[in-house]
Amino acid sequence: MKIITFSHYKEVTDDVLKDSYAVVIDLLRATSTMIWAISNGAKGIIPVEDISEARLLKRLDESVLLGGERGGLKIEGFDLDNSPLSYKKEAIFGKTVVMTTTNGTRALKKASCAKRIFLGSFINAKKTAEYIMKETLHYNIDTISIVCAGTEEKFTLEDILCAGYFVDLFIENFPDVFLDDLSLASHVLYKKFENDPHEILKYSYHYNHLKKLGFEADLEFCLRKDFVDCVCEFRNLVVEKV
């Protein structure tokens, strides 16, 4: 099994993704929020790149909720922001959410040429990795691509740290694994800080940006490991539970 990691979505190359299963990670916060929303009973998440596209879908179907952020903050006129803590069961159960974020929704769209696309986060990594391993073995897939969303088209530390956890899970279970250099680096980073990711992330840009905006509770939430059993897949333009 080959594990290929991309540091941000702009680096993604179709020739690698087209034969692989992809894991898209926007740890802080889009994929964490989408996974939590689906686990709380959202019918589906429709990721879109632009605010105008989200508003158009709302005009076409008033029953959908609008969620997302720009610069980390709720978009004017939207129902929800990008905090996982906003996606309570009573707010989203049975609903479809149209979501647009600065990085995560674009990363999902960029990965669309992969054979299958899964959402990754610390909160559901183990369950997701187990499912991917089972499916790749069954269908003879030999490449897993980890697509880090990044922040504003740049490398971001928290996504790489989470990628390292996925690499760790894959290494434990696949008998023969080839890691590209970024997969290897992400794994080394993860193993050093696996017991306290805050220890390194407290120096990182996006972590501190969210902290300054008052989202400390989101940081704690998104850095907790494996308390969600939900595996989420992006298929036919919608994020749904597998």
From Swiss-Prot:
Catalysed reactions, semicolon-separated:
(2R)-O-phospho-3-sulfolactate + H2O = (2R)-3-sulfolactate + phosphate
Q: Name one Pfam family in it.
A: 2-ph_phosp
Which key words tag this protein in UniProt? Answer: Hydrolase, Magnesium
Q: What is its EC number?
A: 3.1.3.71
- Give the GO molecular function terms: 2-phosphosulfolactate phosphatase activity; magnesium ion binding; sulfopyruvate decarboxylase activity
Q: What is the name of this protein? A: Probable 2-phosphosulfolactate phosphatase
Q: Which domain of life is it from?
A: Bacteria
Cofactor(s) recorded for this entry are: Mg(2+)
InterPro entries the record matches: ComB-like, ComB-like_sf
Give the UniProt family note: Belongs to the ComB family.
Q: Which PANTHER family does the protein's record reference?
A: 2-PHOSPHOSULFOLACTATE PHOSPHATASE-RELATED (PTHR37311:SF1)
